[in-house]
């Protein structure tokens, strides 16, 4: 089959493994497959982390390249979760979303004030450069950028998936700006050059 489906996707099998741990780190979308964990599953993981007093750190740096439905960022913005989510930390990055890798501009979101205080104490006194700040502010001015980028990526991702499939490869269900695929033999390089 050309569609390798869930492959390495996150499942409920992770829930019992949370017990006894202080921190769970997840990438959503998954790296390297680009698959997005369903909101229902992420909510269950968050609830289990709450029960187990385990911090949940979710790297959503590539989420802006997906259709973004049901992300923990969306949940975080919901005032209903505020008192229940002191153990949730979400990482985001301008450097990925706005193609500014050399400028190192990212941020975290959490309601855990104690953790934020510790991060400020441990961080450098000058953690964002002036050029990075200026680029971040400029990036936020283009309100249609993310919509246009998602639309472009949706078409180009499918074109790439179709091409790999035509060459005999199998692709995992990526929703991100990258794909993960399996190819049956070692001739892919030559076929891509042809």
Residue spans of the language-model regions?
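Alpha-helical scaffolding segments of alpha/beta enzyme cores, especially the outer helices
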Residues: 40, 44-47, 80, 114, ...
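PLP-dependent aminotransferase class I/II
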Residues: 87-172
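A short, flexible beta-alpha/helix-coil linker loop
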Residues: 29-32, 142
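Conserved C-terminal alpha-helix-loop-beta "cap" of PLP-dependent enzymes
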Residues: 165-170, 178-194
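Structural motif
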Residues: 23-27, 57, 107-109
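Active-site pre-lysine segment of PLP-dependent enzymes
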Residues: 7-20, 32-56, 60-97
């Amino acid at each position: 089959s050309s569609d390798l489906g869930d492959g390495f996707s996150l499942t409920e099998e992770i829930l019992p493994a949370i017990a006894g741990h202080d921190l769970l780190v997840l990438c959503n979308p998954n790296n390297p497959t680009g698959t997005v964990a369903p909101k229902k599953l992420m909510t269950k993981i968050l609830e289990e982390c709450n029960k187990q007093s385990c911090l949940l750190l979710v790297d959503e740096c590539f989420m802006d390249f997906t259709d973004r439905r049901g992300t923990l960022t969306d949940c975080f913005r919901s005032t209903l979760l505020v008192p229940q989510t002191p153990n949730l930390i979400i990482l985001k990055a301008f450097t990925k979303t706005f193609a500014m890798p050399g400028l190192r501009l990212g941020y975290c979101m959490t309601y855990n004030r104690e953790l934020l205080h510790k991060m400020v104490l441990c961080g450098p006194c000058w953690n964002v450069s002036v050029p990075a700040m200026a680029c971040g502010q400029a990036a936020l001015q283009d309100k249609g950028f993310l919509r246009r980028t998602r639309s472009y990526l949706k078409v180009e991702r499918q074109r790439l998936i179709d091409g790999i499939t035509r060459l005999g490869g199998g692709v995992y269900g990526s929703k991100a700006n990258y794909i993960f695929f399996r190819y049956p033999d070692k001739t892919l390089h030559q076929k891509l050059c042809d």
